[in-house]
């Protein structure tokens, strides 16, 4: 979107999963977009692309989960950035439902190995914020005996920095939306 209101549309990837939300963050002097890709065999891994000097980079895979599903999971990734430090959180289910987190120290050009945030009774609908101290706080929807809760947990590059905490009860229906975190300070 230009200051004059013109929209310059560009196709980043022709195989973006149509129903999963995308997310965007500013990393240094570039925009970083994350999304769920959809290969010819319906493998739905998370990809990242940067808008640098007016052109989109070739997308990179955040992690090859190799989740194959012949339907849209309606469960896209989340990204947060501070300069070249980037955190991406996502839901995946190649063998069981999981929430994962990966860090990048080069603005999303490459990503480290994923950290396991949660597994088992997770629904997904993730969000992430990146704090000044480098910790990423991940939130997700988890199934309970009585419905669902929104959970949040801080992580550093080595793993969990504290325990997961239930933030609020929630409805499991898709119509309840996707919980979002807002960083107020720090």
Task: Report the location of each language-model feature.
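Extracellular, repeat-based ectodomains that mediate carbohydrate processing or recognition
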Residues: 1-186
């Amino acid at each position: 979107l230009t200051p004059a209101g013109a929209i310059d549309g560009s196709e980043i990837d022709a195989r973006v999963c149509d129903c999963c939300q995308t997310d965007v963050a500013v990393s240094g002097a570039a925009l970083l977009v994350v999304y769920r890709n959809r290969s010819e065999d319906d493998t739905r891994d998370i990809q990242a692309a940067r808008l640098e000097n007016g052109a989109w980079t070739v997308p990179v895979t955040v992690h090859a989960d190799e989740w194959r599903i012949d339907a849209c999971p309606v469960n896209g990734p989340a990204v947060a950035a501070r300069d070249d430090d980037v955190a991406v959180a996502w839901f995946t289910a190649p063998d069981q439902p999981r929430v994962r987190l990966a860090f990048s120290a080069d603005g999303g050009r490459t990503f480290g190995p994923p950290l396991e945030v949660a597994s088992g009774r997770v629904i997904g609908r993730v969000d992430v914020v990146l704090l000044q101290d480098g910790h990423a706080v991940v939130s997700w929807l988890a199934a309970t005996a009585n419905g669902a809760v929104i959970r949040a947990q801080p992580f550093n590059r080595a793993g969990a920095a504290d325990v997961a905490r239930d933030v609020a009860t929630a409805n499991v229906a898709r119509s309840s939306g996707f919980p979002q975190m807002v960083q107020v300070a720090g």
